[in-house]
Amino acid sequence: MLKTPLYESHIAANAKMIDFSGWSMPINYGSQIQEHNNVREDCGIFDVSHMLAVDIQGSEAEKFLRYLLANDVAKLQENKAQYGCMLNHDAGIVDDLITYKVTDEHFRIVVNAGNRESDVAWFNQNAQNFDVAITPQTDLAIVAVQGPKAVAVIKRVVTKEIAAEIEALLPFSFKFFSKWMVARTGYTGEDGFEVILPATQVKKFWDSLLENGAQPAGLGARDTLRLEAGMHLYGADMDTSTTPLERGLGWSVDLSDEHRDFIGKKAYLAKKAQGVDTKWVGVVLKTKGVLRAGQEIDFDNGEKGYITSGSFSPTLKVAIGLAYVPKQADNPVVNIRGKELEVELVKPKFVKNGKSLI
């Protein structure tokens, strides 16, 4: 199994390790709920070095990414980041990712751990007609520093000058400090940063964060946090069999420049014209029980919906899920252990900055 540069730190902290996409990763350090609540109320840190930063450089870097991605990087200013999907020719989602614009000729993309090899292969396969160099940065580590006190913690571990610049970063902005890249992004619905830095320096950084008030958090808390925030998990909520239209991600597909072609555009426009017969929703179970991926949602007209992600919400203290359901259907119920339980359909976003949205 693959190990991140912080593997020994996780073992020393008595983390429970699991196999995640071939990587030995911490699921928790004792209490997933405590780790979750700490990110909502204070500051938690995550090792996400199993994800991969890929640099796209060259005179046609922007031109290439305008073709590769469904969102339009031409809209990006330097030191800004953009969420988007990478589609195949059928408009199926190959991955969802964040693109960072360093300069007109240098972009950085962070890809999901389970798609590292396939994404890089897809980049290379589609880059042949462009003047670009694609460089997977395998010698970098990534640490997410998340929570309302993330700024306070990170300020304690860097110089005053750097602290001021980090604090001034706006959401979806980033800055390089030598080989370190600090972005005001995250996967929790809280304020925070993702720090991409040389693997040789990550242990010292991790330890100093812990010494200055941060608590480690595992992938278990990361999953419940992102679910509460209504953020998609690739491989669970969407994959190559789904288009952005069916998963509430149409907003991330930029069609404003009709002259721009991108992979999957033709199929996407056809699907858009045809219309989709499902909608992307949040699900709340008000009674006792747990919502899980794969569960059916039954409606009184005989139609069905399906939950793609589900869990107990530590913040709301109820079971929540993300699901696709028929556009027109009433009285949704889920079947749990032979009992039909009523669920409420809500907007697919439950918590932001520690506050309930439902």
UniProtKB/Swiss-Prot annotation:
GO terms for cellular component: cytosol; glycine cleavage complex. This is Aminomethyltransferase. PANTHER family: AMINOMETHYLTRANSFERASE (PTHR43757), AMINOMETHYLTRANSFERASE, MITOCHONDRIAL (PTHR43757:SF2). Coiled coil: none annotated. HAMAP family: GcvT. It catalyses: N(6)-[(R)-S(8)-aminomethyldihydrolipoyl]-L-lysyl-[protein] + (6S)-5,6,7,8-tetrahydrofolate = N(6)-[(R)-dihydrolipoyl]-L-lysyl-[protein] + (6R)-5,10-methylene-5,6,7,8-tetrahydrofolate + NH4(+). It comes from Francisella tularensis subsp. holarctica (strain LVS). One of its GO terms (biological process) is glycine decarboxylation via glycine cleavage system. The keyword Transferase applies. SUPFAM superfamilies: Aminomethyltransferase beta-barrel domain, Folate-binding domain. Its EC number is 2.1.2.10. Pfam families: GCV_T (PF01571), GCV_T_C (PF08669). The lineage of its organism: Bacteria, Pseudomonadati, Pseudomonadota, Gammaproteobacteria, Thiotrichales. NCBIfam families: gcvT (TIGR00528), PRK00389.1 (NF001567). The glycine cleavage system is composed of four proteins: P, T, L and H. It comes from the Bacteria.
